[in-house]
């Protein structure tokens, strides 16, 4: 199977951390600027973030108690055609299905709107699948209890035509 080329684009402290107080010091400002400028250099169609990063500035927090669904959605990948047509994506690694969204895409200052694709495991509740469909958020199953990264990458390529993905942090 074909998979996208993965670019690992990280801004780290000297001790290898991708988060912390070092982001707030003036000496980091030039590095943050260069980090942002390099994002577009790579020409990636998608950026993959973990649950913590999504909660830190992309998702609308965690979903609360979801209403019981009358008809259980099938446990199959779901692709929103409108979102797919956007051609720019944010892939959210959310194995348990806990992230909340206000719609099918996320728009950050200085970046084009990106369709959200949730990477889930089979453990996710049927109510969450229904919620994602109502929000227009696509989702892919990539493992039973743990995320299978190879499977996820293959599906991103096959179902969304993603050839280059950025793992950012």
Regions of interest found by a model, annotated:
Residues 3-14, 19-159:
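Active-site ligand-binding patch in enzyme domains
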Residues 159-169:
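A contiguous pocket-lining binding segment that forms or flanks enzyme active sites
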């Amino acid at each position: 199977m074909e998979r996208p080329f993965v670019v690992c684009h990280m801004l780290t402290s000297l001790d290898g951390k991708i988060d912390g107080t070092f982001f707030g010091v003036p000496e980091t400002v030039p590095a943050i600027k260069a980090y942002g400028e390099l994002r577009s250099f790579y020409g990636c169609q998608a950026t993959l973030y973990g649950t913590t990063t999504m909660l830190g500035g992309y998702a609308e927090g965690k979903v609360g108690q979801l209403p019981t669904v009358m008809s259980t959605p099938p446990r199959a990948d779901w692709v929103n055609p409108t979102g797919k047509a956007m051609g720019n994506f944010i892939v959210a690694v959310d194995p348990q299905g806990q992230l909340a969204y206000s719609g099918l895409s996320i728009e950050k200052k200085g970046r084009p709107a990106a369709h959200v694709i949730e990477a889930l495991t089979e453990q996710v509740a049927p109510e969450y699948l229904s919620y994602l469909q109502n929000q227009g958020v696509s989702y892919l199953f990539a493992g039973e209890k743990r995320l299978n990264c190879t499977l996820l990458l293959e599906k991103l390529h096959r179902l969304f035509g993603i050839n280059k993905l950025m793992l950012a942090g």
